[in-house]
């Protein structure tokens, strides 16, 4: 039954690319409105080795935008609810569910070097920066190797030996409604996104910069205001500075664009 699951993918990309897709290892941090759609798209296109990372459980307020969130999955760990769905698509896939949060304290729990692709769909500013810093082999440069933020923005820091995989990140998808404004840009060139601006400001303040450039999915639409009162959004609500409104068609575009970046990159290798 599963022999022809990816026939249409192979028709477009070819058998060599299909084999590469099957062999790649991907890890997604954050399974909200962006990460959950990214995961499904990757599995539907042939990724067979996928690790899902999120500490939260499905909440009723997730149902408007998160793929695995239904009235039947409320209260279930997000990683388990999504894993169940993905295995219904491809029962032979190797889907690892890790119900934990990525942070400075837990960073050593993840063997990033074993993955070909790392997808950042984290909401928390601090944890997001930590993932970028650690994955892209950052440390403060001292002495003659120290560079200014301006130089980093222009050229990025030199690539150091170490992890050779690819890193893709999602900027803010909340408070947007226009699907035609979604873009892909190098991190230091993202404009009009408050999250990216806050991340760059924090990196400059602490003199911690990515060792190489990476692509982000973002929106050029100016964030709209919240008009209502936010209800509790899972166990992570009170770790956020605030809870913003968001829509499935935007978060799904972000997630699927991240998946598209992975598939494009694999296809180029063929």
Predicted features along the sequence, with ranges:
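Glycine-rich phosphate-binding loop and adjoining beta1-alpha1-beta2 segment
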Residues: 52-89
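N-terminal charged helix/coil linker that caps or initiates catalytic domains
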Residues: 1-27
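Conserved S-adenosyl-L-methionine
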Residues: 44-49
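Glycine-rich phosphate/adenylate-binding loop
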Residues: 2, 110-117, 122-131, 167, ...
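Hydrophobic/small residue at the entry helix of a nucleotide-binding pocket
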Residues: 34
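Glycine-biased, low-complexity coil/linker segments
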Residues: 142-144, 160-162
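Conserved N-terminal Rossmann-fold NAD(P)-binding element of oxidoreductases
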Residues: 28-30, 53
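Conserved SAM/SAH-binding loop
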Residues: 99-107
């Amino acid at each position: 039954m599963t022999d022809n699951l990816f026939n249409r993918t192979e028709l477009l990309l070819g058998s060599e690319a299909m084999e590469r897709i099957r062999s790649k290892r991907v890890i997604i941090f954050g399974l909200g409105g962006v990460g959950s759609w990214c995961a499904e798209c990757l599995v539907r296109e042939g990724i067979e080795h996928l690790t899902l990372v999120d500490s939260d459980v499905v909440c009723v307020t997730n149902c408007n935008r998160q793929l695995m969130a239904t009235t039947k999955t409320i209260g279930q760990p997000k990683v388990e609810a999504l894993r169940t769905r993905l295995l219904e698509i491809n029962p032979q896939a190797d889907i690892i569910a890790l119900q934990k949060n990525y942070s400075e304290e837990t960073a050593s729990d993840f063997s990033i070097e074993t993955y070909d692709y790392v997808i950042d769909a984290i909401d928390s500013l601090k944890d997001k920066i930590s993932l970028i810093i650690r994955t892209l082999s950052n440390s403060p440069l001292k002495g003659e190797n120290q560079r200014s933020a301006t130089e980093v923005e222009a050229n990025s820091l030199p690539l150091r030996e170490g992890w050779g995989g690819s890193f893709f990140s999602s900027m803010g998808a909340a408070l947007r409604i226009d699907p035609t404004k979604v873009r892909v840009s190098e991190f230091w060139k993202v404009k009009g996104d408050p999250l990216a601006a806050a991340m760059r400001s924090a990196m400059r303040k602490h003199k911690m910069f990515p060792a190489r450039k990476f692509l982000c999915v973002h929106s050029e639409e100016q964030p709209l205001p919240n008009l209502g009162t936010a209800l509790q959004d899972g166990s992570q609500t009170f770790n956020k500075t605030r809870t913003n409104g968001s829509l499935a068609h935007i978060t799904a575009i972000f997630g699927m664009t991240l998946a598209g970046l992975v598939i494009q990159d694999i296809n180029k290798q063929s």
